[in-house]
From Swiss-Prot:
The name this protein goes by in its record: Large ribosomal subunit protein uL18
Coiled coil regions, renumbered to chain: none
Quaternary structure annotation from Swiss-Prot or TrEMBL: Part of the 50S ribosomal subunit. Contacts the 5S and 23S rRNAs.
Pfam family, one: Ribosomal_L5e
Family: Belongs to the universal ribosomal protein uL18 family.
GO molecular function, one term: 5S rRNA binding
Described purpose of this protein according to its UniProt entry: This is one of the proteins that bind and probably mediate the attachment of the 5S RNA into the large ribosomal subunit, where it forms part of the central protuberance.
NCBIfam families, A to Z: PRK08569.1 (NF006342)
PANTHER family per record: LARGE RIBOSOMAL SUBUNIT PROTEIN UL18, RIBOSOMAL PROTEIN L5-RELATED
GO annotation terms (biological process): ribosomal large subunit assembly; translation
Swiss-Prot/TrEMBL keywords: Ribonucleoprotein, Ribosomal protein, RNA-binding, rRNA-binding
GO cellular component terms attached to this protein's record: cytosolic large ribosomal subunit
Length: 195
């Protein structure tokens, strides 16, 4: 840490690497509604936030753990779960009266094809407008076809590794090769359950 009379200590959340205050400042100046997306090592969290001078107000939110209520048996943080969580949050935001929002990615550095954009794709598909350019969202990955193809290939080549890698899927009663069909079932369940 620097010493001397000219050293200014940064804000605590900046020191901890939790908040980019310049980006936060631009969001506050904009005063538009935001869709806040946070990816953890296990889960996906999506919140729709309105600006208020006293503090931000969360209007609608969804967590990838909630997908279990709709019959989801897959992983809670892959691209498919990201899309479903974004879709669920978008439907809830529409119910709350939000029609558009800007993306708040936090400290995440955007890269083409990242999971965070699958969340935004889900939000857009639910009917909430979010400005998003070409970010490499692949519809096959969105439905989990890449996982199903890999599982099929791995089961033939190395059954032990297959059972190890997909143990959570198998323990929950989902054959990973059936993930695209399961995705459609859960998406329909979300559509019917949230309207």
């Amino acid at each position: 840490m620097a010493h001397g009379p000219n050293y200014k200590v940064k804000y605590r959340r900046r020191r901890e690497g939790k908040t980019n205050y310049y980006r936060r400042y631009t969001y506050v100046l904009n005063r538009s509604d935001r869709v806040v997306v946070r990816l953890t090592n296990k889960y996906v969290i999506v919140q729709f936030v309105k600006f208020d001078p006293k503090g931000d107000i969360t209007v609608a939110a969804a967590h990838s753990r909630e997908l279990m209520k709709f019959g989801w048996k897959g992983d809670e943080n892959n691209s498919t779960a990201c899309y479903l969580t974004g879709y669920l949050a978008g439907l809830r935001a529409k119910k709350a009266g939000m029609t558009s929002a800007s993306a708040d990615l936090g400290l995440f550095t955007p890269t083409k094809g990242a999971r965070i954009f699958y969340v935004l794709k889900g939000v857009i598909d639910s009917g909430v407008k979010v400005p998003m350019g070409d970010v490499g969202v692949n519809n096959d990955r969105l439905a989990g076809k890449h996982i199903a193809e890999y599982a099929k290939k791995l089961e033939q080549e190395d059954p032990d590794k297959y059972r190890g890698l997909f143990s959570r899927y198998l323990a929950r009663g989902l054959d990973p090769k059936d993930l695209p069909a399961h995705f459609k079932e859960v998406l329909n369940s979300i559509k019917s359950g949230e309207k």
